[in-house]
């Protein structure tokens, strides 16, 4: 047989010719612009009305006016577009036969062709009619969607089958190289997946992000489709462009059956993506409890350590308390720190899982972590400062009850003589007293270089190394409290704040700068009266007892209960009369 008579080659040549014709039509087709709209003829209006009402005899009369078929309304719809979205097949046939073939590919102003409109409308017979008449099956709408993709979105096996029988391109990419196989995997249509594969579908085809249909099925939790694709040769160990494995995608979807299936067929929980995240991190962040139960035993400690963060961090970041509890039950350390390269990617250089919970204002996760032994003092920016600035009284209470350093400084931007927390609580007496009741060094707010109201100079006290490790006193002395609170935009607060502070002191060394600012405040008469009179012996004893006990014992209720003191005295020592937040909640 002569090579020129090869039927396969003839078929390919015919296909190439058809594709060339289609490209010519695409290049030369009329684009409809609403601003070019001209009034429709009476014949066009009557023709469209006949289509919409299903009057075949009237339609046959009006299609004789060819110009009426070539007129579009303000939406860019020609009579053919109207015909494809109505259910009577004979009407479509009449309009299609009467229309010029160039109109078969014309798009509406929304970018839809007659075929994509028919598919979207779910009219299988209309789709078949268009295809049998020779409408090109591969023209995309302006969103980049092919008729095949739209048919799969509708879940119509019959439409997909009809399109495949008329030489639709199965692997034709849409936006971001998303293919029919990917869409079928996303929608979970096992029958359509089987049909596509039987017609030459590629199980290894990757989208614009390097994800295979297997990865898509795993992400969307379609276990039956996933298993079918695996049996058809899908690669369980395939990686996307960002390094994400199929198991990583399944962890994001959260279907435990998909994860179990992938593990059964050789999937590994120890393969990180390019960011270093493992499937266990993804499941913990997304809050997929059952998926996490599968992943914990198959993920190695070495892989987690190498990643630079723990699933505890991920669960706290994702605000997933149940997953957090599961991880703690399985022995994960709540005080594990982020690796330096990850920590440095955050502006605040956070380290702990607790910091994530506090930043998220997540009271439940904060409580779980603290109950499990989380140390609130491990981050460069102390968790307490974050909670105070966020005005979250409950998290501040929890942190202080579990040993947060109320006298901490933000070590990276430390330019105050006084501990940092108070500067975020000046507008909130409840928060201010919460800090003061728990041992804030209020005397530090009255140390400055201005001298007292009698003209005497103050002496700078030395800062203990354990309080401010690695910092010299010259850094701390830059900005005393009196300078801080008397700036023009905060000067109005000086009276109310100083009135609260003196409740926690024995001797008040008021400097000349503070005095001049206080004299114009409405609280000044009361403050002056307190300054002119000695403190009560009871109050002085309270302050002495607190100094002897130390912050650790004061802030832990269990230790306080061990003291052989009457409850009334215990409450007095703890400044319970000033515990405004506790009074709001009726706390003991």
Swiss-Prot record:
Gene: ASB15
ANK repeat residue intervals: 75-104, 110-139, 143-172, 176-205, 209-238, 242-271, 275-304, 307-336, 349-378, 379-408, 416-444
Domain SOCS box: residue ranges: 524-579
PANTHER family: ANKYRIN REPEAT AND PROTEIN KINASE DOMAIN-CONTAINING PROTEIN, ANKYRIN REPEAT AND SOCS BOX CONTAINING 15
Pathway: Protein modification; protein ubiquitination
Entry's free-text remark on domains: The SOCS box domain mediates the interaction with the Elongin BC complex, an adapter module in different E3 ubiquitin-protein ligase complexes.
Record's keyword annotation contains DNA-binding: no
Family assignment from sequence similarity: Belongs to the ankyrin SOCS box (ASB) family.
Organism placement in taxonomy: Eukaryota, Metazoa, Chordata, Craniata, Vertebrata
Organism: Bos taurus
Function (record text): May be a substrate-recognition component of a SCF-like ECS (Elongin-Cullin-SOCS-box protein) E3 ubiquitin-protein ligase complex which mediates the ubiquitination and subsequent proteasomal degradation of target proteins.
SUPFAM superfamilies: Ankyrin repeat (SSF48403), SOCS box-like (SSF158235)
Keywords: ANK repeat, Repeat, Ubl conjugation pathway
Descriptive protein name: Ankyrin repeat and SOCS box protein 15
Keyword Repeat tagged: yes
Biological-process GO terms, alphabetical: intracellular signal transduction; protein ubiquitination
